[in-house]
Amino acid sequence: DLMRYNDGNIYSVGIKNPNPLSIIAYRQDWLDKLGLEVPTTLDEYYKVATAVAKEDPDGNGVDDTFAFGGYQNVDTTWFDHIFGAFGSLPNYWMEKDGHIVNGSIQPGMKDALVYLNKMYKDGLIDPEFVTDDPKRWQQKVKSGVYGAGVTKIHIFDQNNWSNYYEPFIQAYPEGKH
């Protein structure tokens, strides 16, 4: 009843999801060094993630690389590429068979969580991905800890260049983009 207006009706104003599209940015130099292509399937993705985390692509002789990481207080968009591959997107409403359904309760959700759990247990995801603060995460990205990163496509907008993209160009001037 708290949501009801004084005429007894419940009103809502829908909004477009404010989150821009997520993309995966790969370290092409590491893919080249490992003899791998940008993955196009979940099996290929797991193979690339394993190679990045286990085959020392930075060549420093230390087990210190991960497929990717993240930082605290960020929503599930870090993993939208995984959830989406299984037909489930947490926190999103989607059209399915002519109905609007919640992505968090779709049948593929469990399979996506099992897949992510395996990646985590196998050491492919930085175990500090939920505790690092944004500055620590960015420092890890710049220092070459991650072979890929999930980010918002808007960082490649020229208006955001100095805030997001330029620091990585400075850290990896030979990088392909």
Locations of regions flagged by a protein language model:
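Extracytoplasmic/secretory soluble proteins
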Residues: 1-177
